């Protein structure tokens, strides 16, 4: 990427560059928690020219608000940007072969509050921005075995929310968490259904929910993010301090009654495995019902981008961007393997307002 490309990106995002701590918005009032997330990046071992992309928190309105984004010791060719398709917020940086300092820190301050399903009221229209989440992507086809599986699940059910719940229950009942999967998984749902291997992690299980929902005519999407604090529900559903390995993908579907509705079948399966509980355990039954329409916001959402091109472009599209990603020549550094990519992501709670 050329210097002029970064200059153009910088000029296109002046409002983001003004969000320094002294000028940032105040934390919103009312049951909100404020977190500071810091990426610590060290690419000193990489030689030659290279590029880095970091996913940043998204401003999601009633349950998540970005207060500030700042960085230090970054190269001159660094900017806040977003992809042109999903508008996923990104920090991008480029090093030339002459750059010797390849360490940087990027800090985001973000406020969150627990998300519940909105009360039914009026009719929520499927706008073009919503309708795009009915479409297939490279790793999420909605024809063939995905379509036939969805049709079996929702057979005889016409109400959209009931269809969404039927798919949620099917995913919870038929998948399982596989701890050996790298990172959060790839979300190749066609492969999962064709092989009958429905084991995986959050990007597999929740992507399966999203793909089946789309195939059943329900707009749905993943939200990629990271856990940033301990959970009030189960120990396995929280992480604080060093959250470099605390990434987690969630899901949501669009309801004519409620708008976007939060769901998380993958966390039900995570609790079953890591808390050593059966699906029939009363605590799991309660969690299962709760996570259809609820997100505990000890987690920060990053983006809903799927099978997309980074901005500026990388060598190839990515299935998703939930972790840091870098390219130096033919070397690809994937944050799903932090042992091969010298980065840390830390979280610190700043305030809690009620």
Regions flagged by a language model, labelled:
Residues 24-116:
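Intrinsically disordered, low-complexity N-terminal segments that are enriched in acidic
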């Amino acid at each position: 990427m050329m210097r002029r490309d970064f200059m153009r990106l910088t000029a296109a995002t002046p409002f983001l560059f003004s969000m320094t701590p002294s000028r940032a918005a105040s934390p919103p009032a009312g049951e909100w928690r404020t977190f500071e997330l810091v990426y610590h990046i060290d690419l000193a071992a990489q030689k030659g020219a290279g590029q880095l992309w970091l996913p940043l928190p998204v401003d999601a309105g009633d349950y998540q608000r970005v207060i500030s984004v700042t960085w230090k010791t970054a190269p001159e060719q660094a900017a806040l940007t977003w992809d042109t398709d999903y508008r996923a917020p990104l920090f991008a940086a480029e090093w030339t072969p002459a750059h010797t300092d390849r360490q940087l820190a990027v800090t985001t301050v973000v406020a969150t509050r627990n998300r519940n399903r909105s009360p039914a009221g009026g009719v929520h229209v499927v706008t073009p921005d919503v309708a795009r989440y009915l479409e297939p992507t490279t790793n999420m086809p909605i024809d063939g075995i995905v379509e036939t599986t969805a049709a079996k699940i929702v057979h005889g059910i016409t109400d959209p929310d009931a269809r969404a719940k039927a798919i949620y229950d099917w995913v919870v009942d038929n998948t399982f968490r596989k701890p050996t999967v790298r990172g959060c998984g790839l979300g190749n749902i066609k492969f999962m259904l064709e092989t009958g291997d429905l084991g995986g992690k959050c990007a597999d299980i929740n992507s399966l929910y999203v793909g089946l929902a789309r195939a059943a005519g329900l707009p749905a999407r993943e939200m990629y993010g990271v856990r940033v604090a301990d959970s009030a529900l189960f120990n396995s559903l929280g992480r604080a301090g060093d959250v470099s390995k605390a990434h987690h993908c969630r899901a949501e579907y669009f309801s004519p009654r409620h708008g976007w509705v939060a769901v998380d079948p993958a966390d039900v399966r995570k609790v079953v495995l890591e808390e050593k509980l059966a699906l029939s355990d009363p605590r799991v039954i309660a969690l299962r019902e709760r996570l259809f329409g609820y997100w505990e916001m000890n987690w920060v959402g990053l983006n809903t981008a799927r099978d997309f091109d980074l901005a500026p472009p990388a060598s190839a599209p990515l299935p998703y961007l939930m972790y840091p990603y870098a390219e130096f020549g033919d070397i690809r550094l994937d944050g799903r393997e932090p042992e091969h990519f010298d980065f840390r992501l830390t979280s610190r709670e700043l305030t809690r307002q009620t």
